[in-house]
């Protein structure tokens, strides 16, 4: 009986060691020991077992981050999303990566390329709609007040010097922009949502004659 119990226990141990969770544990241990090739092998084996779960991709990205290769870590997520464009958890993992590595501006680009409504709904708090201008760009013979708005809750920032605005370099939009002098003015604007994620830059050019 004791032998049977031992065999069962050993079988459970082996099963765990070869399970998804077991591969993750081995992978992170290898990362901590700077054994990156071994870590990659373990995380790849975990992905083979279940490619839909984000944990192993996070582990693969950690291999690159541990070597100060942020671009390599980013490629892990983008490649996974390319093959699984409807995987909500992968998108969330990629967003977490961008936020943790202080690259919130890349979240907007990631979600702009997403065509799956379920994914967009699951990460709706991160979605940042680009601003809209009224009136539209063009040539006018009289003074114009340019209104900038967005359906996204957050702050609008703009520039009139031809540079792309950021929350640090742009002017915070508080009231319509008055164009009263003759000449051409390019207004560029973004929205920064409550998560600190900026939208894409929208540019409109106005000429007052």
Name every feature range the model reports, one short phrase each:
Residues 70, 74, 78, 88, ...:
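Short, compositionally stereotyped local motifs that mark structural "simplifiers"
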